[in-house]
């Protein structure tokens, strides 16, 4: 049983490493604001299209929040799927 637990822990750790290599993209305003994030929910980059124009600071902040939340939702989905795959066969409640 300990060996099985160690194998499962190893799979989870490998999955965490793999999630650092998976990226998702969140966007706002038809792609004029883009945020790239890893499957582990770490922001890699934020891009603002130079043609965005016409937005004040508060509107731009709102667009950044929208793009961030979009990326977070996608990263959470990827993370959940990867962790489910890694924990397949685990004993429930462990």
Regions found by a protein language model. Give the residues of each.
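Short terminal (N- or C-terminal) low-complexity/amphipathic segments
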Residues: 34-36, 60, 65
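A short acidic/small-residue loop/turn micro-motif
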Residues: 50-52
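Residues at secondary-structure transition points
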Residues: 54-62, 78
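Long amphipathic alpha-helical segments used for membrane anchoring, targeting, substrate engagement
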Residues: 1-21, 25, 74-94
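Stable alpha-helical structural segments in soluble proteins, enriched in small hydrophobic residues
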Residues: 63, 67-75
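Residue-level signature of catalytic and energy-coupling elements of molecular machines
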Residues: 5, 41, 64
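N-terminal intrinsically disordered, cationic/polar leader segments
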Residues: 27-46, 55
């Amino acid at each position: 049983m300990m060996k099985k637990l160690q194998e499962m822990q190893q799979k989870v750790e490998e999955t965490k490493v793999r999630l650092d290599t998976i990226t998702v993209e969140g966007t706002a305003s038809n792609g004029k604001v883009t945020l790239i994030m890893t499957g582990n929910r770490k922001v890699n980059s934020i891009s603002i299209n130079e043609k965005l124009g016409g937005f004040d600071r508060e509107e731009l902040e709102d667009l950044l929040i929208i793009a961030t939340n979009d990326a977070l939702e996608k990263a959470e989905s990827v993370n959940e799927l990867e962790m489910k795959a890694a924990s397949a066969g685990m004993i429930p409640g462990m």
